[in-house]
Amino acid sequence: MCGVDTGRTVDEKPAPKRPRTRTRTRGKALVVAAVLTALLTAFPGLVPDTAGNPGSLLETFRPWTGPAVPVLLLLALLRRSRLAAAATLLPAAVWLGLFGPALLAGGGAGDGDRGGGEGRGDGSSGALTVVQHNASDENPDPAGTARALAEAGPDVLALQELLPGALPAYRRALAADYPHHAVVGTVGLWSKHPLSGTGPVDIRPEGLGADWNRGMRTVARTPYGPVAVYVAHLPSVRITPVGGFASDRRDESAAALGRAVAAEELDRVVLLGDLNGVAGDRALAPLTSRLRPAHEAAGRGFGLTFPAAFPVVRIDQVMVRGLTPVRAWTLPATGSDHLPVAARLAP
């Protein structure tokens, strides 16, 4: 009887299956990355502000941990790891829990509900309307910027980076609608209501000259009573490969401004400023522990303000005490590299 040759001897054994250690290792690495992303998004305070201030850096760009989720999911699909794909649900849930409500309220990640002049203020609407803008010392059209801001109809308008050469243009453009104004150094305030008690606020970090004046306080005599208005421009921060998140001068200035606010005797306080920091940055705790950020209370979207061409952070702030934010939004771009921000505040 003729047999069938199978090509295999009796002693031969099936070839062992190839180990999947590498695939599993890659899958586990993605799981770890997903868990870390979720933890850092939910608890940025876990990262200390050691050399380079990594904690503040994470808090500054915290919303931008969101794009890590689709990247992790794509890598999980490429690795064909079901466990890694499922793990991406954790950072997705954390991110949506933190930032989803702001997006669902309306507005996108960048515009924060760019409004027009519906909140025009003269006290008759039952709310105080304020506008804050770093007008830029390189603004090619100061007068046009001033007119655009006035169209929003704020009761008070705060400006930073006011250079002596551009100041007359701002004064002329705003004179008709804002009979009261005060300027200290490179910051100023224009108001529909009388101002009194204007003076500088010393927020100068150590090592800077006496000509560095970027803080002021005045009292606006509004229909709701006196309101202490602070205008400030904190020092810039830098991100470098060697120094990391260089924010020491900004942090020192924020602490000084916080002490000034803590000593304020009036019940109603408004801070308008380019703080070069987001409200969630731990370095601004001297301010956020005493004042309520208007955008967090009544804004839509992320309300990003800088840089104006493609905003990635909200460093221009309205913060209050003794007043209730009812709306907060960004205004259309001007000749500045910052977007203006506005808020309506109920007494």
Which residue ranges define each predicted feature?
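Soluble catalytic domains of enzymes that build or remodel membrane lipids, polysaccharides, and related
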Residues: 126, 136-150, 158-347
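A charged, solvent-exposed segment within the mature domains of Sec-exported extracytoplasmic proteins
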Residues: 1-3, 14-19, 240-251
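N-terminal, active-site-proximal structural segment of metallo-dependent hydrolase catalytic domains
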Residues: 2-171
